[in-house]
A protein has these predicted regions:
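Bacterial N-terminal signal peptides
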Residues: 9-21
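Signal peptide processing junction and immediate N-terminal pro/mature segment
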Residues: 21-27
Length: 257
C-alpha cells in the first residue's frame, strides 16, 4: 500500500513538473507554448545559450582525455572531457544573457538598478535598456562618485551630479548604441550598456528559456546578447495565433561585433 502511495505521489510530482511553463516572465507570470495566445496576438520564445569557442571546447576535450594533462594549461579539461574553468575565464553555463526584442510599440520608462559596491565592483556587469528608460544608480562605496554614460563608438556622453557615499540618483537614458556606465574616480566600476529604441528584454541564465508573449503580428528584430561575446541578430515574423520558436547560441564564432 505504501509503495502504491509513493508511486502515485511520484507520478503526480512528475506530472506537475511537466506541466510547468517553460519560462517565467519578469512579472511573475508563466509562459506555456502549449497554450494558445490571445486572439489577434502571437509570441516569440526559445532558448538562449552562451558557449566557449568550438575550437576551445574541442581542444579542452582532447586534453581532458589524457591522463597526464597539465592543470596549468589554459585549455586544460577534466578527465571526462569537460572544460575546467579558472578565475580568469567566464563559465558560460552560468552566464546571464539577454534576449532582446525591438518593438516600436514598447513604452520606455523601465527602471534598471545599478549598485557600486567598492571591493565587490559594480553590479550588474551588463544592462540592456531602451532609450528613455531609467538607470537608478546607488553609491554603496565610501567615496563620492561622478557617474557618466558614454558611447564607446563615439563622443556622446551624459552625466549626473556627484553622488555622495550612500546616495542614489536616476539617469534617464538619452543615448542609443553600445555604451558604458562608469565613474571619473574609479574605472573599475563599470557596466556595459546596450541601448536601443523600443527595446524589450529578458535576462536569463544561459541555457534557459525566454518569451515575449502577446505581441502584435509583424516583423521584429530579435537580438541575443552577452557583453563578453557580442550580439547575435535575427529577424522574426510574429503571426496571430502562433508561438514562434527561435533559439540562439552565442559564441565568439557566431556573434556580430
Amino acid at each position: 500500500m505504501m509503495k502504491q502511495v509513493f508511486g502515485i505521489l511520484a507520478a503526480a510530482m512528475i506530472a506537475g513538473l511537466l506541466a510547468l511553463p517553460v519560462a517565467v516572465l519578469a512579472d511573475g507570470h508563466g509562459f506555456d507554448p502549449d497554450e494558445p495566445p490571445p486572439e489577434g496576438k502571437g509570441s516569440v520564445y526559445g532558448t538562449v545559450t552562451a558557449r566557449p569557442h568550438k575550437d576551445y571546447v574541442k581542444k579542452a576535450k582532447e586534453l581532458g582525455s589524457k591522463e597526464d594533462y597539465d592543470d596549468n594549461d589554459p585549455y586544460a579539461g577534466s578527465a571526462d572531457g569537460k572544460v575546467v574553468y579558472n578565475d580568469t575565464m567566464v563559465n558560460y553555463d552560468f552566464a546571464d544573457v539577454y534576449a532582446i526584442l525591438l518593438n516600436p510599440a514598447a513604452k520606455p520608462g523601465k527602471v534598471h538598478e545599478v549598485e557600486a559596491e567598492g571591493d565587490e565592483g559594480q553590479k550588474p556587469r551588463a544592462l540592456a535598456v531602451a532609450f528613455g528608460d531609467i538607470i537608478r544608480i546607488k553609491n554603496a562605496t565610501s567615496k563620492p562618485l561622478t557617474y557618466f554614460l558614454a558611447d564607446i563608438n563615439g563622443d556622446s556622453i551624459q552625466e549626473i551630479p556627484l553622488l555622495p557615499p550612500g546616495g542614489s540618483a536616476d539617469m534617464t537614458v538619452e543615448l542609443v548604441g553600445d555604451l558604458e556606465l562608469t565613474t571619473d574616480e574609479d574605472d573599475s566600476l563599470i557596466t556595459a550598456v546596450l541601448s536601443r529604441e523600443g527595446l524589450q528584454s529578458q535576462r536569463v541564465r544561459s541555457g534557459s528559456t525566454y518569451a515575449f508573449p502577446n505581441m502584435n503580428p509583424g516583423e521584429y528584430d530579435l537580438l541575443f546578447w552577452f557583453w563578453r561575446l557580442g550580439i547575435l541578430k535575427r529577424k522574426v515574423t510574429v503571426e496571430a495565433g502562433e508561438h514562434t520558436d527561435v533559439d540562439g547560441v552565442l559564441s565568439v564564432d557566431t556573434v556580430v561585433r
